[in-house]
């Protein structure tokens, strides 16, 4: 069965975070979290560099996730001058680790 890229929502400190997720079929695969460019300058998880990086990890056997920070796309909340966005990244990484390493 072929894995697919899933559109998901991750619980974040300011509400739901919109994300795309690919889970490798290999249970020992490494993980990667790809973050968007600065949201105040038009950065989203759909930025070409983000998408290309996501696919490069995916093509090399990683379980990989890309996330929109708070207030971007379908993510809840609003821009928080970097502090909230750092908390969003931490929440996404925690989720990614639980999804891939918890038994």
Can you say where each PLM-predicted feature lies in the sequence?
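Serine-hydrolase catalytic machinery in alpha/beta-hydrolase-like enzymes
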Residues: 16-101
């Amino acid at each position: 069965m072929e894995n697919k890229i899933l559109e998901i929502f991750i619980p974040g400190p300011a509400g739901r975070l919109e994300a795309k997720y690919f889970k490798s079929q290999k249970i020992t695969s490494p993980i990667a979290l790809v973050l968007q460019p600065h949201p105040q300058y038009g950065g989203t998880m759909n930025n070409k560099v983000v998408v290309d990086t996501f696919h490069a990890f995916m093509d090399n056997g990683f379980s990989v996730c890309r996330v929109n920070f708070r207030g971007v796309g379908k993510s809840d909340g609003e821009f928080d001058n970097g502090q909230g966005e750092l908390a969003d990244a931490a929440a996404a990484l925690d989720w990614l680790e639980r999804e891939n390493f918890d038994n």
